[in-house]
């Protein structure tokens, strides 16, 4: 003990104990007044481990001290990565897993969620590095053992001080009157907010309905166009403000505002037919901007009978033309969604009213935030920033929650009314942009490059090229911004009339739909749906081509952002993309690719693998044990191979790969075991010698990591990427192993 006391004298607030029981007793005394307990991956590890250790070292009765009012922790099973895990829920005291909070409130997938890596990324600090196992560290370097444990706790504290996710969850809980732990989901929070809004109006909320287990919650998705592939110059984009919440507000969508539904006999027959022929549900809706019944109404069709299912239980059979007369020409306060759902605007629905209030509140909060930033009041700035972020989370969560069958207010008619009406609005925006530039109302016209959900990318450059070359139209970065602003203003002014014509929305409701010019880019690369990049120099009026920089890159869906692409490859792809968007020539870029291949070749084999997540390992192993050789995903097989080789080599120190773990998959050459690949855990900081000596298949990994990734990025340019492999192939002929 004296030696240990000497080792810790430089560490404040560090207490040594003779026994584990004494330490746990002190821990329970320390947390007696704590409201929230948190740790990193604490739901799956720290919480069950601590409960079990208290039970063993003290007694089961002592686990009551983790809770309030003398209650016992409640054992709970939950599914994680396809496997059943066990944890404990505390009574009275809240436990929030910092790892799960981080996943919830950061919107990009990380390569790894190891505390070490997240600490480095967020606060510039990592865990204390040591050799061997923690047991060896405890026995051989007690001082570093203490330092390691203190740094773990310090990292969590610094992450919380910077990110304030526990505070954010607490604010959400108070705003929506739910329990703190309830904020980890989205449905219950949104549902309670709707209930509160209804009660505020003096309304009674209906009981939770029983759902048909066979009912579908599938709804047609957003409009996504096929892009005009390749490089484009002088690109502008328009973006509809919060499309789905705005659609819900404009058509006053809510369970209590539904008047009737055009039964989708024709639509369902078409969708079922496509699915029967092999289409997916999403593909079956490709190119449709409304149900067939809605289109019959808009075309004033008289040839097809439509059944209207009224909300009072009655039905009517009418033609499209007759329904048009009832809704559009009879002065009824009715609106028709693109899904064929009839809503009333006689009174404001609870959900649209809630969205309206949240919008107004967020606007006020953002105004206060700007005042605090201007006054350099950091304390108030943090407060208002957190409040407006909560409102943003609420707004973005509502649509997804009401389309979840677990939500009390779930109604597929509202979900599909939102998406299909949103499709039509996005199509109108693109068509109107093209009309302003070319004179033709066409959503895939000459000026339109791409459309995705709530945005449209366009360019007037090719359409006006002759006039620009003749000098008839001034064309500079500044004049392009002015031109695209003018186009956006003209398009934006057309939404109220469009909403009246298409959905019988009163002007006051149609004005809810608004769009603005988002970016102006000097160049853009469009590859396929959901995959593109632009180099923009102006975003919503703020210039980004300052301090000698050409602007900023916006990249969507590319491998340089994907978590299954190695970090060094992400950086290289970003370098190539930057060169392409800055106008570098093919020869220069191919030369750089050739250099990178040489650099790649020099890397050890384990650095050339592909990141994956290994799910359902346990299930596949059980199937294989029962039925012999079983088909499974390659990365799962590679993970099992790691576990087998670890066991064969007597490796007791490396980490076993378990369900849900992130791994790096490395290809290997022919070998006596017949393995084609072996994975290793992303979080394995010290790779064993037996793994480093595996016969890695460098050429196959080069194909996977370089060839495929480059083809995904710049293959649409049809450059001679094959030429960059020739020197590399030649030099490999003289490599001996």
For each feature predicted by the language model, list its residue ranges.
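Catalytic nucleotidyl-transfer cores of nucleotide-processing enzymes
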Residues: 78-88, 105, 212-408, 528-547, ...
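Common nucleic-acid-contacting/processivity interface regions adjacent to the catalytic cores
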Residues: 135-283, 377-432, 450, 459-461, ...
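C-terminal, non-catalytic extensions of nucleic-acid polymerases
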Residues: 485-737
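Catalytic palm subdomain of template-directed nucleic-acid polymerases
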Residues: 456-487
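Short, basic/hydrophobic alpha-helical segments
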Residues: 18-34
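Short glycine-rich phosphate-binding loop at a beta-alpha junction
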Residues: 35-43, 449
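Active-site-proximal helix-loop-helix substrate-binding element of RNase H-like nuclease domains
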Residues: 3-14, 18, 37, 47, ...
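Active-site palm subdomain of RNA-directed nucleic acid polymerases
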Residues: 127, 426-453
């Amino acid at each position: 003990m004296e030696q240990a006391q000497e080792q810790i004298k430089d560490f404040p607030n560090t207490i040594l104990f003779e026994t584990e029981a004494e330490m746990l007793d002190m821990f329970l005394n320390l947390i007696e007044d704590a409201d929230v307990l948190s740790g990193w991956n604490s739901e799956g590890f720290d919480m069950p481990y601590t409960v079990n250790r208290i039970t063993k070292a003290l007694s089961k009765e002592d686990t009551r001290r983790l809770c309030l009012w003398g209650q016992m922790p409640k054992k709970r099973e939950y599914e994680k990565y396809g496997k059943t895990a066990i944890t404990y829920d505390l009574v009275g005291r809240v436990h929030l897993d910092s790892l799960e909070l981080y996943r919830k409130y950061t919107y990009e997938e990380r390569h790894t969620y190891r505390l070490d890596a997240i600490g480095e990324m967020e606060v510039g600090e990592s865990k204390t590095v040591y050799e061997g196992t923690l047991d060896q560290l405890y026995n051989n370097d007690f001082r570093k053992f203490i330092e390691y444990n203190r740094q773990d706790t310090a990292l969590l504290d610094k992450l919380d001080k910077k990110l304030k996710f526990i505070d954010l969850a607490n604010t959400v809980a108070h705003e929506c009157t739910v329990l703190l732990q309830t904020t980890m989901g989205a449905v219950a929070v949104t549902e309670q907010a709707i209930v509160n809004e209804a009660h505020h109006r003096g309304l009674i909320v209906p009981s939770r309905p029983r759902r048909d287990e066979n009912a579908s919650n599938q709804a047609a998705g957003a409009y996504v166009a096929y892009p005009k592939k390749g490089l484009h110059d002088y690109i502008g984009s328009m973006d509809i403000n919060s499309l789905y919440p705005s659609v819900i507000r404009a058509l006053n969508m809510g369970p209590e505002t539904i008047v009737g539904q055009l039964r989708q006999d024709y639509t369902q027959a078409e969708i079922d037919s496509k699915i029967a022929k092999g289409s997916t549900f999403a593909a079956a809706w490709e190119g449709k901007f409304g149900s067939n019944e809605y289109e019959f109404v808009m075309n004033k069709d008289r040839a097809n009978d439509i059944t209207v299912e009224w909300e009072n239980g009655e039905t009517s059979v009418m033609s499209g033309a007759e329904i048009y007369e009832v809704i559009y020409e009879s002065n009824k306060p009715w609106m028709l969604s693109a899904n064929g759902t009839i809503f009333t605007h006689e009174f404001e629905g609870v959900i649209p009213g809630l969205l309206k209030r949240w919008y107004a509140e967020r606007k006020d909060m953002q105004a206060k935030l700007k005042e605090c930033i201007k006054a350099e009041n950091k304390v108030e700035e943090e407060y208002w920033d957190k409040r407006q972020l909560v409102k943003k989370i609420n707004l973005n969560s509502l649509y997804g929650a009401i389309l979840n069958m677990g939500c009390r207010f779930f109604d597929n008619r509202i979900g599909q009314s939102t998406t299909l009406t949103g499709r039509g609005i996005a199509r109108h925006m693109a068509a109107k942009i093209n009309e302003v530039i070319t004179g033709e109302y066409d959503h895939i016209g000459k000026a339109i490059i791409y459309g995705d959900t709530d945005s449209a990318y366009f360019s007037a450059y090719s359409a006006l090229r002759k006039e620009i070359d003749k000098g008839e139209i001034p064309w500079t970065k500044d004049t392009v911004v002015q031109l695209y602003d003018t186009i956006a203003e003209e398009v934006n002014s057309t939404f109220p009339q469009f909403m009246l014509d298409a959905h019988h929305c009163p002007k006051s409701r149609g004005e809810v739909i608004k769009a603005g010019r988002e970016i102006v880019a000097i160049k853009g690369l469009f590859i396929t749906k959901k995959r593109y990049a632009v180099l923009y120099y102006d975003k919503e009026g703020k210039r980004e081509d300052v301090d000698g920089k050409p602007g900023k890159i916006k990249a969507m869906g590319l491998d340089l952002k994907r978590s299954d692409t190695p970090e060094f490859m992400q950086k290289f792809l970003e370098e190539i993309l930057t060169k392409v968007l800055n106008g570098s020539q093919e020869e220069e870029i191919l030369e750089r690719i050739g250099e990178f291949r040489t650099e790649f070749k020099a890397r050890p084999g384990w650095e050339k693998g592909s990141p994956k997540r290994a799910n359902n390992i346990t299930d596949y192993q059980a199937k294989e044990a029962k039925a012999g050789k079983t088909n499974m995903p390659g990365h799962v097989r590679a993970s099992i191979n790691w576990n087998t080789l670890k066991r064969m080599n007597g490796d007791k120190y490396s980490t076993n790969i378990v369900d849900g773990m992130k791994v790096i998959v490395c290809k290997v050459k022919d070998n006596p075991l017949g393995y084609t690949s072996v994975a290793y855990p992303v979080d394995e900081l010290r790779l064993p010698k037996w793994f480093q000596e595996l016969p890695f298949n460098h050429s196959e990994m080069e194909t996977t990591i370089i060839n495929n990734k480059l083809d995904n990025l710049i293959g649409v340019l049809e450059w001679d990427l094959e030429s960059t492999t020739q020197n590399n192939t030649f030099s490999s002929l003289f490599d001996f192993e």
